């Protein structure tokens, strides 16, 4: 039926559809109106409703006929039938799913009174325009034609700069969320005087100078301001500028580096007394009381963020030692230990790290570890080998054995092949260069980060790490990027092979001299007996137990194996959450066979318990009841936040 219909303006161009260029706001608006098909069936004027729009003189004679019913001409549709076509969700002319109530109103208006659909109508009708995710790059001057426009939403586009002279003076709401604007300076050239809301969240505003553009000189009537998730720094300068906005009631600053300092919320609330909502959280009277007076000393507060990283228990670790054969007298003697590593951002301005729990080890990225990122780590260049050799040589000359005993881990985390040992501290660089060092890329920190690890612990069903580390950072922009990326947590197994050292028997001059002295002593005693002299009484000595001297062992470089590795999302800390607490689950690594071997070993130990003690029964493991615990580790990262003005001044006053 509709195939026979023909639009009266089918051959005409849509008014105002000339496209001056792609990527403009006006082009996106026209494209949207074109998709509404306001001049095509069942909207607009055409053969389906042309009798309704005949000149009045042609219809006069019909009106003179008494009691004549209005009859639709053959081939035409009633208004109700046409409205049914656009309202029915099953109709091919139904609106698209992303359409709004305004689109529905325009289509019905184009059916009831299609002659109203003109450029003049559009420019005077629209009070709100929403152009979202349309690849818009330019706010063009055609927007000035919208005489009553009050709200302009241009979210999720690719706008880098806004010419404020192209904004209608009637504008009250300007939303530019999710664009690529790097400075507010372009908006301040000729801002709409009556603007009440400005949204610039998730853009690329950077640095402390942006505070110059949020004053009452540019936005005298601003009530709501969204600057969240940019790279704004210098909280003190920002709140000093915002203080001039007397009408400001709603403010969003979370997601910026300046919001990571512990006193951020308190200083902002005390500086902006008229503020009602900060970061979508209502400002309470109690908060205003707790932080009263903090703004008077705001310039004395250090601009740094503080995090506390806590690592709890490791569970579900495979006891690898039960898979090794019993060592013979010649070795090797195997020792296993387990620890957790995580990376944290490096502070270019000098990181202050405080260990508030057990001793924490820091593995700083060496030049070699940063370069070895290939999947085949055996392919090591000569330059890299030289760097590694240099670092190893320095460690060797500084008493290699004592370093290993104190730290429990060589600074270069290497995975060795066949056992290769540094026999003497004076090993030459040529010998060291022959070592085939293999560095696991998974144990190297990401660029711009430092690798931290817990102390090494022996195997247990539950391995308690007891780790707590405080990180204080002043370089806040890289810190924000790190929080967006997250930290990588790794569980590492360290295996060290030890071998007995066989010392060659060498006759020294000291031992020869000692032997000669004993021989002379025996000769004198013999002469004394021959002369009849009495032998002096020998002192009675208590027999002592023979002490077994500990065998001297040499150790191979540690063999490191990554048992589990995963990413911990830290973005909630940037979005205002004070704590991220999670249990990293790396799946099953234990097997029924390994657990049975562990059970058998433990049962042997129980049999050796003293006879007085009643041995505990060990339940056997059956395959039907076997439910191994997955490999997990507890991780918690907290962003420090001050709860009062007194606490902020005590902790951060310079």
From Swiss-Prot:
InterPro entries per record: Cilia_flagella_integrity, Leu-rich_rpt, LRR_dom_sf
PROSITE patterns: LRR
Entries under SUPFAM superfamilies matching the protein: L domain-like
Comp. bias regions, Basic and acidic residues: 515-542
The keyword Transferase is annotated on this UniProt entry: no
One Pfam family linked to the record: LRR_8
LRR repeats, residue ranges: 148-168, 170-191, 194-213, 221-242
Keywords annotated in UniProt: Leucine-rich repeat, Repeat
Top-level taxon in the UniProt lineage: Eukaryota
Domain LRRCT: 256-294
Region Disordered, residue ranges: 1-25, 510-548
Protein name: Leucine-rich repeat-containing protein 43
